[in-house]
């Protein structure tokens, strides 16, 4: 068989080119911007213009009052997840996620000293198994990691699912005397078909950190640009970006390339 009949499911590398507007913007930057600043270090919290633009886009799209202080640029969604988990957990904490899940969640969580626990799947819908979730949401859990649209199932978590999940998180947080953070991994948010819409998890639960990447939506996986968006009203909203900035420095994962943020 020819290569056109071979499908590689080992890596989510887009098979369509990036938008021509991106290429044109890069060419303009290289031709017109002063090279020293264009290729120099950006602030440890990221390029202010990029952060402001992302906040404005999220506010316009989802109706939540994001500001620059809520946005932390990262090297794709992978960097976003790793930083978000480190910011809201301590060694010995537990993190819940739902099967099936992106395999790298395991090392991301292990790197923080926390323990990943996996909620069993709910076939055939593969919406989160909320009965099992409620039972597994013990006092040790400080973070829940979700992925919608899901990799590998493609399932979009419904508004009903997110409403019920938020109610469970709110109830358990009150019971245990500490807020449980929701880290929402959303690199496929813009890639849906058949008229489907993707409910925004942060709209359902206040203590949410959204992790996004332009790798899939703009076909730019090699450029490594994403962000963490701390929901307005989230516990620690005024310090979480500072925390992730320090985590980035001390783990050697500084901000994405300056030119990509521009």
Language model: regions and residue ranges:
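Conserved PLP-anchoring active-site segment centered on the Schiff-base-forming lysine
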Residues: 87-109
